[in-house]
């Protein structure tokens, strides 16, 4: 065979931090609450967001608007009402939570709805006029079903049912 000598190709410049072809945004990883697929991580994030929002709405600062980020009606309206009553009664709660996702499912024909079952431990201390009310404070572990729906690219809880105490 013949050989070609004395010919050198220029070095190839290759950067791995950019794509050689444009990648549509829909392919890139998104903020997980915006992700269309209800998987285990998403389910846990939805429940943790709910518990955090609940703690803010019923907490000493009465951040009722926090509920808007995770609940949808009719559940949203009932929790807003509950939070306003707490504020009017000069009451608030402090929470500690732990969550374990037990199962999740969604209909094959509608990935915008789903059901999450979780075991939630809630330790709550109630305060009225700045004083702790022991009789209304509790430490409970509950099995809870959350019915969720995706609205505006974000998962929201539309119904909560306690299955076991």
Where are the predicted features?
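Amphipathic, hydrophobic N-terminal targeting peptides for secretion and organelle import
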Residues: 1-28
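Exposed beta-sheet edge and beta->alpha loop/turn motif
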Residues: 3-5, 111-165
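Core segments of small alpha/beta cavity-forming domains
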Residues: 27-97
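N-terminal, helix-rich and Lys/Arg-enriched segments in bacterial and organellar proteins
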Residues: 47-48, 71-74, 102-104, 114-118, ...
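Generic recognition of flexible, low-complexity loop/linker segments
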Residues: 53-54, 102-104, 145
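Generic marker of residues within folded, mature protein domains
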Residues: 91-94, 106-108, 136-138
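Short amphipathic beta-strand and strand-loop transition segments with alternating hydrophobic
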Residues: 99-109
């Amino acid at each position: 065979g013949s050989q070609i000598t004395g010919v050198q190709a220029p070095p190839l410049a290759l950067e791995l931090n950019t794509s050689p072809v444009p990648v549509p945004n829909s392919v890139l990883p998104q903020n997980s609450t915006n992700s269309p697929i209800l998987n285990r991580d998403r389910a846990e994030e939805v429940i943790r967001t709910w518990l955090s929002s609940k703690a803010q709405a019923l907490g000493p600062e009465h951040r009722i608007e926090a509920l808007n980020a995770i609940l949808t009606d009719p559940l949203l309206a009932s929790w807003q009402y509950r939070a306003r009553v707490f504020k009017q009664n000069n009451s608030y709660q402090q929470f500690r939570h732990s969550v374990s996702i037990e199962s999740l499912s969604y209909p094959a024909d509608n990935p915008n709805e789903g059901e999450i079952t979780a075991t939630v431990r809630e330790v709550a201390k109630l305060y009225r006029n700045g004083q702790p009310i022991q009789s209304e404070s509790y430490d409970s572990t509950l099995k809870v079903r959350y019915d969720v729906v995706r609205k505006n690219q974000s998962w929201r809880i539309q119904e909560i049912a306690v299955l076991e105490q």
